[in-house]
Amino acid sequence: WDIEVPGYKVNNKEWLKSQVSRAFLPKYFPNYEKYLWIDCDAWVNDWNSVELYFKACDNGKLGITQTIGPGYKITSKVNWLIGKLAVIKSQNFKHAVKSKIGYAKARKLAFAPHINIGVFSLEKNSKAWSLWQKNLAIALKAGNIFGSEGLAINMSVYIDDLETEFLPLNCNWITSNLLPKFDEQKEIFVEPYLPNYKIGIMHLAAGIWKDGKDMRINKEIKIEIETLDNKKILKSLRYIN
């Protein structure tokens, strides 16, 4: 483990090491100038997004995408109690409270647009690595292993003001948040709203579920999506080779 965690948190789930080691990529792959991480449930639909990520991390910046954009009807979950009283249920706030980083910091994260760590780019010598590692160590003291690396990067950006190049939503298109459309003429997935830019990286985070089955695991699953000609077709959102 790059950061020691109690055995009871691991509970024989050795794969959780990957949740920590992601913040130490240059240690494991030292001979590269730039690093682009793409989760295993994501795939490249348009190569231009890859070039954008490599450009985004110039001069030590973090290249990453916020999970907010046209068509998002809700950005944070809130349970309203009575009048103005409410319980904040945003992903950042929930993880921050669980990790006991302090309410002052948790409040700064509460309504900040969540940053998904499934796709990002960094230069080898960026100070972002050490900042991320520092915040990850803090988050792991009380929080769960799974999700701590995401909380740590949100802390680095929104609390420590890590210099960040925010890329368009289509550079990390989370399908469970908003389904794409399909351009049948060009045979490519596109954004559902004008001007219907190409999806850069399709990310099946949280899964696409049908009849209790997850498309990430079951290659046979297809769902109904719209085309640019307003037709409805059955389509898999997986990479098809």
Question: Where do the language-model regions lie?
Answer:
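Glycosyltransferase catalytic domains, chiefly GT-A lineage
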Residues: 1-241
